[in-house]
Amino acid sequence: MSITAKRARRGLLLASLLATVAASAPVMAVVVGGTRSTNVAAQADHSIAELRNEYKRPPVIAFPSGNPYTPQKVLLGKKLYFDTRLSGGNVLACATCHNPGYGWGDGQPKGIGHGMNVLGRRSPTIINAAYLQILMWDGRAGSLEEQALGPIQADVEMHLPLDQLMARLKGIPEYGPLFESAFGQKDIQPSMVAKAIATFERTVVSGRAPFDQWGAGDEKAISEEAKRGFVTFNTKARCAECHGSWRFTDDSFHDIGLPSDDIGRGKFLPDVVKMQHAFKTPGLREIARRAPYMHDGSMPTLEAVVDHYDEGGVARPSRSDLMKPLQLSSQEKADLVAFMKTLTSDVGPVSVPVLPRLNNSSSTRRET
């Protein structure tokens, strides 16, 4: 089914649910049970069940034909991802700003680069990056392979030119066999580094969350508050207009009215009014681990995020037409936060790989 067809189908489901909610004064009763003796309640249950199906997870991870999955590439990519020798000062790795302990971000309002330079935006998570067609807050990268080498070379980020990166990796004997196993040759090339890191990053997928269990039919998997929040998310609050699909994103760009001089996507589309101050819609999976929020890290909590959308943001020509005051009640706000928290899974710790040494005396060591 095409994206357009999916959106059309979803729109019909939302329209049905909105009509049902409007016809039923006690909305909470419609969602969570209680005294319900009308056909309206049954219709609401059916609409919600249909809507839950729209958020079902795909069965497999997406890997491109030009860079298919192999365990050898994942092993190599993970080592490269955690290796600080991919930075000019030998202190920064991909994992520094995209740390599994912080929802594959860094827990800071703004990223920290070479020489403790404070970057202009928050470090985006790599969770579910396998499914992205365009990356970065402003969409400047067209693939994970393209994105992988960008921060390494950037002066303000990892600060290591590609020729120096190649010389450094070739000077670490243990990397040679790893590249040969993954790509069939020891002569390390930048494209091989990019493909290995990208392959590992595609394995970083959000875990099965309470919301998924509820979607599969376990009514006790989430609270009654969260169930109400799901309906509000899809109706009155209009969150699902941009945060749809199983990843809870439309993969598009919107100006949500944050008071910032950063024009985001507008740098690449200067003549498109609605792209000024527009940033990529982030997915909401594992959201409870990923504070602070927004591209500028300006929202410390999910409660602050909900308040921002409820108020409507800064009015300007580029602001999304969807950004209007919502007039949510305190209960509706709490319900929304409760629902969003159900999108976070109970994942375990990620093991840090043993990195290749400068000599090959320990080439048989295994990962912990």
Mark where each language-model region is.
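Periplasmic c-type cytochrome electron-transfer domains
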Residues: S2-T368
